[in-house]
Amino acid sequence: MSLRVVYLGTPQFAATVLKTLLDAHTHIVGIVTRADKPQKRSSKLISSPVKQLALSKNIPLLQPIKTTDPAFLAQLREWQADVFIVVAYGVILKQELLDIPTYGCYNLHAGLLPAYRGAAPIQRCIMDGGVLSGNTVIRMDAGMDTGDIANVNYVAIGEDMTAGGLAEALAASGGELLLKTLQEIEAGTVRHVPQNEAMATLAPKLTKEEGGIHWDAPASQVYAHIRGVSPAPGAWTRYLSQGKGARRLGVLSARMESFSGNYGDPGEVLGVSGEDLLIACRQGALRLRMVQPEGKALMKAKDFFNGQSRLVSKLF
Protein backbone atom coordinates (compact mmCIF):
# COMPACT_ATOMS: atom_id res chain seq x y z
CA MET A 1 0.00 0.00 0.00
CA SER A 2 1.53 3.31 -1.10
CA LEU A 3 -0.82 5.72 0.70
CA ARG A 4 0.95 8.07 3.11
CA VAL A 5 -0.99 7.82 6.37
CA VAL A 6 -0.93 9.95 9.53
CA TYR A 7 -2.43 8.21 12.57
CA LEU A 8 -4.12 10.06 15.45
CA GLY A 9 -5.00 8.07 18.59
CA THR A 10 -4.35 7.79 22.30
CA PRO A 11 -5.60 4.83 24.46
CA GLN A 12 -4.94 1.09 24.30
CA PHE A 13 -7.85 0.63 21.88
CA ALA A 14 -6.09 2.93 19.41
CA ALA A 15 -2.72 1.23 20.00
CA THR A 16 -4.20 -2.19 19.19
CA VAL A 17 -5.64 -0.86 15.93
CA LEU A 18 -2.36 0.87 15.07
CA LYS A 19 -0.44 -2.37 15.56
CA THR A 20 -2.73 -4.10 13.05
CA LEU A 21 -2.00 -1.37 10.49
CA LEU A 22 1.74 -1.55 11.12
CA ASP A 23 1.78 -5.35 10.90
CA ALA A 24 0.17 -4.99 7.46
CA HIS A 25 3.00 -2.62 6.41
CA THR A 26 0.77 0.44 6.18
CA HIS A 27 2.94 3.46 5.35
CA ILE A 28 2.52 5.46 8.58
CA VAL A 29 4.51 8.67 8.06
CA GLY A 30 3.63 10.24 11.41
CA ILE A 31 1.64 9.72 14.60
CA VAL A 32 -0.25 12.21 16.76
CA THR A 33 -1.27 11.44 20.35
CA ARG A 34 -2.36 13.40 23.42
CA ALA A 35 0.17 15.03 25.72
CA ASP A 36 1.57 12.92 28.57
CA LYS A 37 -0.55 13.04 31.73
CA PRO A 38 0.55 12.83 35.40
CA GLN A 39 -0.39 9.82 37.47
CA LYS A 40 -3.30 10.36 39.85
CA ARG A 41 -1.18 9.90 42.97
CA SER A 42 2.14 11.32 41.79
CA SER A 43 3.65 13.88 39.46
CA LYS A 44 5.17 11.22 37.19
CA LEU A 45 4.09 11.66 33.58
CA ILE A 46 2.56 8.68 31.80
CA SER A 47 2.83 8.20 28.04
CA SER A 48 -0.19 6.98 26.09
CA PRO A 49 -0.15 3.43 24.67
CA VAL A 50 -0.04 4.93 21.17
CA LYS A 51 3.05 6.98 22.05
CA GLN A 52 4.79 3.92 23.45
CA LEU A 53 4.14 1.99 20.24
CA ALA A 54 5.25 4.92 18.07
CA LEU A 55 8.53 5.23 19.95
CA SER A 56 9.18 1.48 19.71
CA LYS A 57 8.79 1.69 15.92
CA ASN A 58 10.77 4.96 15.56
CA ILE A 59 7.85 6.71 13.85
CA PRO A 60 7.77 10.54 13.96
CA LEU A 61 5.50 11.66 16.80
CA LEU A 62 3.66 14.86 17.70
CA GLN A 63 1.90 15.66 21.00
CA PRO A 64 0.19 19.04 20.55
CA ILE A 65 -1.33 20.88 23.48
CA LYS A 66 -3.88 22.34 21.04
CA THR A 67 -4.70 20.87 17.64
CA THR A 68 -5.34 24.40 16.35
CA ASP A 69 -1.73 25.47 16.98
CA PRO A 70 -0.28 26.87 13.71
CA ALA A 71 3.11 25.20 14.22
CA PHE A 72 1.42 21.82 14.71
CA LEU A 73 -0.72 22.25 11.60
CA ALA A 74 2.37 23.25 9.62
CA GLN A 75 4.12 20.05 10.70
CA LEU A 76 1.12 17.98 9.63
CA ARG A 77 1.27 19.57 6.20
CA GLU A 78 4.99 18.78 5.92
CA TRP A 79 4.17 15.07 6.28
CA GLN A 80 2.26 15.32 2.97
CA ALA A 81 -0.28 12.71 3.98
CA ASP A 82 -2.81 11.19 1.62
CA VAL A 83 -5.14 10.32 4.48
CA PHE A 84 -5.46 10.79 8.24
CA ILE A 85 -6.77 7.89 10.36
CA VAL A 86 -8.32 8.92 13.68
CA VAL A 87 -9.01 6.35 16.41
CA ALA A 88 -10.04 7.48 19.91
CA TYR A 89 -7.79 10.54 19.77
CA GLY A 90 -9.92 12.34 22.34
CA VAL A 91 -10.40 15.78 20.77
CA ILE A 92 -12.95 17.06 18.24
CA LEU A 93 -10.89 18.22 15.26
CA LYS A 94 -11.50 21.48 13.42
CA GLN A 95 -12.13 21.72 9.69
CA GLU A 96 -8.72 23.31 9.04
CA LEU A 97 -7.05 20.09 10.17
CA LEU A 98 -9.54 17.84 8.40
CA ASP A 99 -8.77 19.58 5.10
CA ILE A 100 -5.03 18.82 5.19
CA PRO A 101 -4.80 15.27 3.73
CA THR A 102 -5.49 14.66 0.05
CA TYR A 103 -8.32 12.16 0.58
CA GLY A 104 -9.58 13.47 3.92
CA CYS A 105 -9.73 12.08 7.45
CA TYR A 106 -11.32 8.76 8.36
CA ASN A 107 -12.42 7.85 11.87
CA LEU A 108 -12.93 4.38 13.35
CA HIS A 109 -15.90 4.63 15.73
CA ALA A 110 -16.50 1.74 18.16
CA GLY A 111 -20.24 1.60 17.57
CA LEU A 112 -22.85 1.25 14.85
CA LEU A 113 -23.47 4.80 13.70
CA PRO A 114 -25.65 6.77 13.68
CA ALA A 115 -26.46 5.19 17.06
CA TYR A 116 -24.22 6.00 20.02
CA ARG A 117 -22.42 9.09 18.78
CA GLY A 118 -19.92 10.30 21.35
CA ALA A 119 -17.23 9.13 23.75
CA ALA A 120 -18.87 6.03 25.30
CA PRO A 121 -20.55 3.92 22.58
CA ILE A 122 -19.20 0.63 23.96
CA GLN A 123 -20.33 1.17 27.54
CA ARG A 124 -23.74 2.61 26.75
CA CYS A 125 -24.59 -0.09 24.22
CA ILE A 126 -24.06 -2.79 26.86
CA MET A 127 -25.84 -0.75 29.55
CA ASP A 128 -28.85 -0.53 27.25
CA GLY A 129 -28.96 -4.32 26.98
CA GLY A 130 -27.54 -4.39 23.45
CA VAL A 131 -26.64 -7.75 21.89
CA LEU A 132 -24.92 -6.42 18.76
CA SER A 133 -22.20 -3.83 18.31
CA GLY A 134 -19.56 -3.14 15.70
CA ASN A 135 -17.21 -0.61 14.17
CA THR A 136 -18.08 2.18 11.76
CA VAL A 137 -15.53 3.96 9.55
CA ILE A 138 -16.64 7.45 8.57
CA ARG A 139 -15.14 10.21 6.46
CA MET A 140 -14.93 12.92 9.06
CA ASP A 141 -16.59 16.31 8.99
CA ALA A 142 -16.59 19.00 11.66
CA GLY A 143 -19.48 17.40 13.58
CA MET A 144 -19.24 14.76 16.32
CA ASP A 145 -19.38 11.37 14.57
CA THR A 146 -21.64 12.78 11.83
CA GLY A 147 -19.57 12.02 8.72
CA ASP A 148 -20.56 9.78 5.82
CA ILE A 149 -20.17 6.03 6.40
CA ALA A 150 -17.46 4.22 4.44
CA ASN A 151 -17.49 0.77 6.07
CA VAL A 152 -19.13 -1.20 8.89
CA ASN A 153 -18.51 -4.52 10.62
CA TYR A 154 -20.40 -6.34 13.39
CA VAL A 155 -19.45 -7.89 16.72
CA ALA A 156 -21.88 -9.90 18.86
CA ILE A 157 -22.09 -8.94 22.54
CA GLY A 158 -21.84 -12.09 24.64
CA GLU A 159 -24.23 -12.41 27.59
CA ASP A 160 -21.36 -12.03 30.06
CA MET A 161 -19.23 -9.60 28.02
CA THR A 162 -18.07 -6.45 29.78
CA ALA A 163 -17.23 -3.12 28.19
CA GLY A 164 -13.57 -4.06 28.50
CA GLY A 165 -14.11 -7.34 26.67
CA LEU A 166 -16.14 -5.69 23.92
CA ALA A 167 -13.46 -3.02 23.47
CA GLU A 168 -10.85 -5.73 22.90
CA ALA A 169 -13.06 -7.45 20.32
CA LEU A 170 -13.82 -4.20 18.50
CA ALA A 171 -10.17 -3.14 18.45
CA ALA A 172 -9.15 -6.50 16.98
CA SER A 173 -11.69 -6.27 14.16
CA GLY A 174 -11.41 -2.51 13.74
CA GLY A 175 -7.88 -2.64 12.40
CA GLU A 176 -8.96 -5.02 9.65
CA LEU A 177 -11.87 -2.75 8.74
CA LEU A 178 -9.49 0.20 8.41
CA LEU A 179 -7.16 -1.82 6.18
CA LYS A 180 -10.12 -2.60 3.93
CA THR A 181 -11.04 1.08 3.84
CA LEU A 182 -7.49 2.19 3.01
CA GLN A 183 -7.34 -0.31 0.16
CA GLU A 184 -10.62 1.08 -1.20
CA ILE A 185 -9.38 4.66 -0.90
CA GLU A 186 -6.25 3.76 -2.84
CA ALA A 187 -8.28 1.93 -5.50
CA GLY A 188 -10.81 4.76 -5.77
CA THR A 189 -13.70 2.46 -4.86
CA VAL A 190 -14.53 3.70 -1.34
CA ARG A 191 -18.20 4.59 -0.82
CA HIS A 192 -19.57 7.42 1.34
CA VAL A 193 -23.13 6.89 2.58
CA PRO A 194 -24.79 9.73 4.55
CA GLN A 195 -25.99 8.83 8.03
CA ASN A 196 -29.70 8.64 8.78
CA GLU A 197 -30.14 11.54 11.21
CA ALA A 198 -33.53 10.21 12.31
CA MET A 199 -31.74 7.19 13.83
CA ALA A 200 -29.03 9.16 15.65
CA THR A 201 -28.51 8.72 19.40
CA LEU A 202 -25.85 10.05 21.75
CA ALA A 203 -23.35 8.25 23.99
CA PRO A 204 -21.70 10.89 26.21
CA LYS A 205 -18.76 10.08 28.45
CA LEU A 206 -19.76 8.27 31.64
CA THR A 207 -19.38 9.88 35.04
CA LYS A 208 -18.40 8.00 38.20
CA GLU A 209 -21.88 8.61 39.58
CA GLU A 210 -23.39 6.73 36.64
CA GLY A 211 -21.72 3.59 37.96
CA GLY A 212 -24.28 3.50 40.78
CA ILE A 213 -26.49 0.40 40.79
CA HIS A 214 -30.28 0.72 40.97
CA TRP A 215 -31.57 -2.53 42.43
CA ASP A 216 -35.20 -1.63 41.70
CA ALA A 217 -34.85 -3.06 38.18
CA PRO A 218 -34.92 -6.56 36.68
CA ALA A 219 -31.76 -8.56 37.34
CA SER A 220 -30.95 -8.65 33.62
CA GLN A 221 -30.94 -4.85 33.52
CA VAL A 222 -28.80 -4.55 36.65
CA TYR A 223 -26.34 -7.07 35.22
CA ALA A 224 -26.15 -5.16 31.92
CA HIS A 225 -25.39 -2.00 33.88
CA ILE A 226 -22.56 -3.65 35.82
CA ARG A 227 -21.02 -5.09 32.65
CA GLY A 228 -21.35 -1.78 30.83
CA VAL A 229 -19.38 0.21 33.40
CA SER A 230 -16.67 -2.43 33.82
CA PRO A 231 -13.79 -1.74 34.10
CA ALA A 232 -14.47 2.01 34.09
CA PRO A 233 -15.94 4.01 35.70
CA GLY A 234 -16.89 0.92 37.72
CA ALA A 235 -20.13 -0.26 39.33
CA TRP A 236 -20.89 0.57 42.93
CA THR A 237 -23.63 0.37 45.52
CA ARG A 238 -23.99 1.36 49.18
CA TYR A 239 -24.40 -0.49 52.45
CA LEU A 240 -24.81 0.54 56.07
CA SER A 241 -21.66 -0.09 58.08
CA GLN A 242 -22.05 -0.36 61.85
CA GLY A 243 -20.93 2.92 63.41
CA LYS A 244 -19.84 4.41 60.06
CA GLY A 245 -23.11 5.03 58.25
CA ALA A 246 -23.46 4.56 54.50
CA ARG A 247 -20.35 3.23 52.75
CA ARG A 248 -19.66 2.53 49.10
CA LEU A 249 -19.12 -0.99 47.84
CA GLY A 250 -17.47 -1.41 44.45
CA VAL A 251 -18.86 -4.32 42.43
CA LEU A 252 -16.17 -5.71 40.15
CA SER A 253 -17.83 -8.88 38.94
CA ALA A 254 -21.24 -10.52 39.14
CA ARG A 255 -23.39 -13.06 37.35
CA MET A 256 -27.06 -13.77 36.85
CA GLU A 257 -28.93 -16.11 39.17
CA SER A 258 -30.47 -18.81 36.98
CA PHE A 259 -33.93 -18.71 38.61
CA SER A 260 -35.82 -15.57 37.52
CA GLY A 261 -38.62 -15.46 40.10
CA ASN A 262 -39.09 -12.95 42.90
CA TYR A 263 -36.69 -13.25 45.83
CA GLY A 264 -37.37 -10.28 48.08
CA ASP A 265 -37.20 -6.51 48.22
CA PRO A 266 -34.83 -4.87 45.70
CA GLY A 267 -31.33 -4.69 47.18
CA GLU A 268 -32.08 -7.22 49.92
CA VAL A 269 -29.06 -9.35 50.82
CA LEU A 270 -30.33 -12.92 50.63
CA GLY A 271 -27.13 -14.49 51.94
CA VAL A 272 -24.19 -16.51 50.68
CA SER A 273 -24.81 -19.02 47.89
CA GLY A 274 -21.74 -21.07 47.09
CA GLU A 275 -18.94 -18.57 46.43
CA ASP A 276 -21.33 -15.68 45.77
CA LEU A 277 -23.46 -13.15 47.62
CA LEU A 278 -27.06 -13.27 46.42
CA ILE A 279 -28.87 -9.92 46.03
CA ALA A 280 -32.56 -9.50 45.20
CA CYS A 281 -33.62 -7.29 42.29
CA ARG A 282 -37.10 -6.13 41.32
CA GLN A 283 -37.32 -9.33 39.32
CA GLY A 284 -34.82 -12.12 39.79
CA ALA A 285 -31.53 -11.90 41.65
CA LEU A 286 -27.87 -11.25 41.03
CA ARG A 287 -24.81 -13.06 42.33
CA LEU A 288 -22.02 -10.73 43.41
CA ARG A 289 -18.60 -12.34 43.04
CA MET A 290 -15.84 -9.77 43.65
CA VAL A 291 -16.33 -6.52 45.55
CA GLN A 292 -14.24 -3.72 47.03
CA PRO A 293 -15.48 -2.03 50.21
CA GLU A 294 -14.69 1.67 50.48
CA GLY A 295 -11.10 2.12 51.67
CA LYS A 296 -10.31 -1.60 51.51
CA ALA A 297 -8.81 -4.16 49.15
CA LEU A 298 -10.60 -6.25 46.55
CA MET A 299 -12.19 -9.37 48.04
CA LYS A 300 -14.71 -12.13 47.42
CA ALA A 301 -18.27 -10.97 48.04
CA LYS A 302 -18.91 -13.81 50.48
CA ASP A 303 -15.83 -12.78 52.51
CA PHE A 304 -17.12 -9.21 52.66
CA PHE A 305 -20.47 -10.45 53.97
CA ASN A 306 -18.91 -12.76 56.53
CA GLY A 307 -16.45 -10.03 57.58
CA GLN A 308 -19.35 -7.70 58.36
CA SER A 309 -20.61 -10.30 60.85
CA ARG A 310 -23.53 -10.78 58.45
CA LEU A 311 -25.02 -7.46 59.62
CA VAL A 312 -25.40 -6.11 56.08
CA SER A 313 -29.01 -6.80 55.14
CA LYS A 314 -29.55 -4.45 52.21
CA LEU A 315 -27.68 -2.67 49.43
CA PHE A 316 -28.91 0.64 48.06
From Swiss-Prot:
UniProt-recorded name of the protein: Methionyl-tRNA formyltransferase
CDD domains referenced in this protein's UniProt entry, alphabetically: FMT_core_Met-tRNA-FMT_N (cd08646), Met_tRNA_FMT_C (cd08704)
Taxonomy of the source species: Bacteria, Pseudomonadati, Chlamydiota, Chlamydiia, Chlamydiales
Highest rank taxon of the organism: Bacteria
Catalytic reaction annotation: L-methionyl-tRNA(fMet) + (6R)-10-formyltetrahydrofolate = N-formyl-L-methionyl-tRNA(fMet) + (6S)-5,6,7,8-tetrahydrofolate + H(+)
EC id: 2.1.2.9
UniProtKB keywords: Protein biosynthesis, Transferase
InterPro entries for this protein: Fmt (IPR005794), Formyl_trans_C (IPR005793), Formyl_trans_C_sf (IPR037022), Formyl_transf_N (IPR002376), Formyl_transf_N_sf (IPR036477), Formyl_transferase-like_C_sf (IPR011034), GART_AS (IPR001555), Met-tRNA-FMT_C (IPR044135)
General function of this protein: Attaches a formyl group to the free amino group of methionyl-tRNA(fMet). The formyl group appears to play a dual role in the initiator identity of N-formylmethionyl-tRNA by promoting its recognition by IF2 and preventing the misappropriation of this tRNA by the elongation apparatus.
Binding site for (6S)-5,6,7,8-tetrahydrofolate: G111, L112, L113, P114
Gene3D superfamilies, alphabetized: Formyl transferase, C-terminal domain (3.10.25.10), Formyl transferase, N-terminal domain (3.40.50.170)
Sample GO molecular function, one term: methionyl-tRNA formyltransferase activity
HAMAP family: Formyl_trans (MF_00182)
Alphabetized PANTHER family for the sequence: METHIONYL-TRNA FORMYLTRANSFERASE, METHIONYL-TRNA FORMYLTRANSFERASE, MITOCHONDRIAL
Family: Belongs to the Fmt family.
GO cellular component: cytosol
